[in-house]
Amino acid sequence: MVRRIYVEKKPGLRQEARGLLHELQTVVGVSALEDLRLLNRYDVEGLDEAAFRRAVGTVFSEPQVDDTAAALPAGDCIAFGVEPLPGQFDQRADSAAQCIQLMTQEERPTVRTARIYLLFGPLTAADVDAVKRYVLNPVECREASLDLPERLAAETAVPADVETVTGFTALDRAGLDTLLARLGLAMDLEDLSFLQAYFRDTERRDPTLTEIRVVDTYWSDHCRHTTFSTHLDHVEINDPAVQAAYNRYLAAREEVYGPEKAAQRPQTLMDIATIGAKVLKRRGLLPEIDESEEINACSIHVAAQVNGKPQDWLLMFKNETHNHPTEIEPFGGAATCIGGCIRDPLSGRAYVHQAMRLTGCGDPRTPVAETLSGKLPQRKLAQTAAAGYSSYGNQIGLATGHVAELYHEGYVAKHLECGAVVGAAP
């Protein structure tokens, strides 16, 4: 049996709803919206009535600040809900289920959540659609049904046989290009041609669709830095300062690799990014660098003062950018940006104790109506990304000592989300 409860802040404590109301009226331009209420909806399966009643006042709500109800409040309003996409991690639901299990000391129940919006005023269909577009990011969530489901357990379909891409090894270039578009692959035509040659000459068979999808995923820019490894065959620079820096890079290549090897070695953005450290290492100016088979983050030997005595410690540094993930899913993208930074020194047994966030965004005051097609409003992006970063950092207990927010029209094309951490290990 599925049990349902709605939770809403008490009157006078509904700051989030008032803030969103003001934003929708002034930023989105829905002037006919007179009032707005926000409720959290919990659906629970696998919990008896007595335990459910206990959970209402201990897990789902705080009686001092929340009101609860078994049904949506009556009134002349437009109601709709937003829930995570199937398969999307629902932290609120997961935390609630864990808390209930701690409370009952029994099997963990199934919990599903949704955010319910109640809109008041003489709204047109266009007004309601504008509100939905602003609060609903289709990359991570969808509109939820207001009906009570009969069960919450996901239906498990029997998987079909894995499809073989018959004729793949015999496709000509035009055929590969058609397949590339049909499957919506991240790799380009040259990548797919390389994959075709491998299956034709080495495996001597056609690949399965799963194999192509797996290779496409791990061949993507996010996994193997495809862009940074691209060979720069022709470089044309108009800015004198940038040209001077590029000339220094060319000189550094000859110093590190030697003139003959430098001429044969491809120029890449990755090489440009790492050449400075290679030069310093070659000159013997980096004796403190720790090099081992276990390279999780940049590690430097330091003499740390512990109780007034020097001890040999490793100071670890790690940075990460999550530009595109944050662009399409601001909360999760920014959260996993700092999360990825933390993970690497943490896996080196370091205590991560300090962080930094650099972010670049377009003008958040830009009217929502001017948002480019396929993109989120800059205001929404900036605010939600900040919430995602701070959420992860606060939960793990990490102090972020420096935050810099850069606003420039160039970041409309692609958001900048850069996190960095330092940690230490004895």
Where is each model-derived feature located?
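Core nucleic-acid recognition elements
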Residues: 1-426
